[in-house]
């Protein structure tokens, strides 16, 4: 975690979910803009404070998933896993909730504290849609779910309060439990990671990525015993979507 005086928060979400607009509401015009090391993707940082705590905000690129197929996805993964992000604020378009939740389930597997910011709630209300704000957190493992509107600037204090509280409380962990065959393989792979890379944290996420034959993870954490034919990416993806359908 970061220092006692500062909490580092990563804002992440699908493209066009209103993430950057919400980020800018908190940070104003006082932004630090540069490129992520080695790539042309912009890195945008800002700061805010709440109840005497300084909060550094990082606006991560808009992505749909945490694969390693695009530069934006690689940048986001690297930042979350290696740059001491204390809390993840996952901004979602509440009017297209099902489409946005795939990324949420992936983030929960990374072992970091996640807060779901339901943006565009004003649009949900205008369209007469309903979201069960009691059931949704339960189905996502008890993570904070905060309705906000970047456009109307509502729910901002509640979101910052959730950041402080969830920072102290820690991660809720993964909510998707796969079929027994895959769960057994995840457990076996975690044990191998423990043997070969004992200091590696969030081993479940890395184990899942290895079973998906994620090229970047395979390069950094090769396990010779993993068969090249062993690729469970489709099953893992499908079971995530099955879980979302239940929501």
Regions found by a protein language model. Give the residues of each.
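Conserved G1/Walker A P-loop phosphate-binding module
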Residues: 1-69, 82-83
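Solvent-exposed alpha-helical segments within well-ordered globular domains of core cellular machineries
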Residues: 24, 46, 58, 71-78, ...
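Catalytic cores of large soluble enzymes that bind and process phosphate-bearing ligands
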Residues: 33, 64, 68, 95, ...
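Conserved nucleotide-binding/hydrolysis micro-motifs of P-loop NTPases
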Residues: 38, 62-63, 94-98, 120-125, ...
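Conserved C-terminal guanine-recognition region of P-loop GTPase G domains, centered on the G4
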Residues: 46-51, 75-145
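Canonical P-loop GTPase G-domain recognition
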Residues: 122-177
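Extended helical scaffolds that flank P-loop GTPase cores
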Residues: 144, 169-247
């Amino acid at each position: 975690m970061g220092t006692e005086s500062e909490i580092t928060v990563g804002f992440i979400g699908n493209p066009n979910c209103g993430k950057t607009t919400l980020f800018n509401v908190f940070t104003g015009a006082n932004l630090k803009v540069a490129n992520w090391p080695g790539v042309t993707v912009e890195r945008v940082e800002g700061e805010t404070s709440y109840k005497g705590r300084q909060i550094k905000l990082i606006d991560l690129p808009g992505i749909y998933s945490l694969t390693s197929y695009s530069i934006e996805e690689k940048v986001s993964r690297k930042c979350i896993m290696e740059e001491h992000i204390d809390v993840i604020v996952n901004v979602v378009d509440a009017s297209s909730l099902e489409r946005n939740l795939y990324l949420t389930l992936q983030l929960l597997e990374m072992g970091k504290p996640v807060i779901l910011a339901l943006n565009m709630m004003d649009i949900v209300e205008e369209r007469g849609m309903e979201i069960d704000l009691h059931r949704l957190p339960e189905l996502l493992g008890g993570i904070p779910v905060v309705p906000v509107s970047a456009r109307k600037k509502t729910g901002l204090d509640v979101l910052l309060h959730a950041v402080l509280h969830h920072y102290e409380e820690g991660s809720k962990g993964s909510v998707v439990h796969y079929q027994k065959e895959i769960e057994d393989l995840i457990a076996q792979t975690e044990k191998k990671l423990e043997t070969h890379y004992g200091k590696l944290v969030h081993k479940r996420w890395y184990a899942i990525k290895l079973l998906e034959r994620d090229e970047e993870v395979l390069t950094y954490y090769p396990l010779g015993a993993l068969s090249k034919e062993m690729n469970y990416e489709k099953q893992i993806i499908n079971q995530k979507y099955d879980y979302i359908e239940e929501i």
